[in-house]
Amino acid sequence: MTIFSKIIAGEIPSYKIAENEKFFAFLDIFPLREGHVLVVPKTETDKFFDLPDEFLSEMLLFAKPIAKAIERSFNCNRCGVEVVGLEVPHAHMHLIPINSANDLNFTKDKLKMTPEQMKKVQETIVGNL
């Protein structure tokens, strides 16, 4: 069972943004930028393009209102989408408020945010859904 499956099951706490029968979205606890959200299928699949075809389109449709809420919540030009999949063997996409390509640089130091800051970000995004 991956760490994402444990988060989905409620075994590990998270800052949930949205959920439906197939997908779960929550704040990345090691964000590149404030408002960095992970969108994860509830079906545990290692590689993104090993997901069933219908999941790929449904995942984007699930992510779209979250991306729009991120854009409304933070000072950014757009919500960037990144699929990397090297750290956790569970397909997922990153939704990140960006102003330039450098904002998607995963080699940069991650933000250190307090639980209070994370909760405020969660409430802001959810409030803009």
Predicted regions and their residues:
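HIT superfamily nucleotide-processing domains
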Residues: 1-129
